């Protein structure tokens, strides 16, 4: 174990040293922008780019409501979308007249149009895109950049399947750009941004669908897969049933395509003529497939949605080193190398001890959900009447994985989210899942808590497993951890992913169901748990009579404390839904 950690540590440190070598800087991009540090291969490209920093008023199109920062872009727009009109010559009176008229128009910035020069926007007018070109007003590029920056600040650090160093918002597909903006809008938790997200989603998704109709092979492009994964994620956690349904259809399609295209076994090599851009695309796809697995099993963990992808299908190396992937310079392919571990190899090591992960974000979550996959499969035994045989190997692997993440030093955001998910998976190991026979949805969370609101303790949808095969005391240690975490840390996740909120919701739900089945625990565990209950009720300032009452009679009182703990604003507006679900009627 020690040798393995030491070897990986040496490799990571070596890679970090190589990143700082001057020879790795892309010598072809010799023209840097003095305002944003972007680099260009040709001076004329730099000159055109500098127009983006200009404070001059954009020039409006005389035939629609599009505005362009440069005259050459306006000419190109007119040629593509108004080809029956004459092209406006530079400096003509028409341009001046239109500019004067445009200054009198109301500046509505609530809708964003597709990028007219993007690869996925039709070169000729298409009727289905008419609202995005003629009816809705244009949002300025600097406003768009605000949300792009938000994406890379809030979402990307946890799920880095986009190569940020090669990402340039000025030359990517319009639909790809909008998929990032949708996620950023949802992360803020601001109601006006939610409305904006739906409009971004609508425009971006329609452009992408039209682009894919033109050539079925386009679905294999890395940016297309990434865009659809982001649109899927946004839909699954949107608070309307319509978008959620679209998200599940997209998820099913993405899983099917990953298998059909062989992406669950995708590998790459630096040998041969493969250039760096191809390597980046292959690594993007591979990381996206891993994130697809994470998404499926997160839905299983929180909502009991039956997953279809298994970790045993992911027969490819884990993502490459974080140091290489996050480098701000495009490296030569000579410095790229595959991760030596695949998920199964890493899991085998975790049985015996921790390991140093070259990449913590995606790898850590994949391994965590893989262990949960094994725990969940074992729990299926109770569905056919077989006794559950707790496997301590899973508990040991979880402990070793936690140490591995600490050794690998992930970013603070990843550490917090991983810790929440880790405690929930451990809770599943110690406590039964009474919702195993059913799924819940984000729009109907109250259905999972209705039993303690109307005193309907018996329900065919819920199972009441034999508690003697579980450890109620250890399970409740995780519930107590969740309450303390919610009190001290949850308020920090205001502009962020809703993972901690949903994870704590599920931990508390498991705890409440365990209280219902409290009377089933063995006598030897009863005394220990009673002491734990008194400790908890005292720390929560519960009434004295509640502290001395059997936990199974205090479900409603405890749920009120849970509702209060979750009553914080957060990304995606999840907090109020969770609070409402737990608040007793």
From Swiss-Prot:
Gene Ontology cellular-component terms for this entry are: chromatin; nucleus
Indicate where this protein resides in the cell.
Answer: Nucleus
- What is a single Pfam family found in this protein's UniProt entry? zf-C2H2
User: CDD domains from the entry?
Assistant: fungal_TF_MHR (cd12148)
Ordered alphabetically, the record's keywords are: DNA-binding, Metal-binding, Nucleus, Phosphoprotein, Repeat, Zinc, Zinc-finger
C2H2-type Zn finger ranges = 31-53, 59-82
Record protein name field: Zinc finger protein C11D3.17
Q: Which organism is it from?
A: Schizosaccharomyces pombe (strain 972 / ATCC 24843) (Fission yeast)
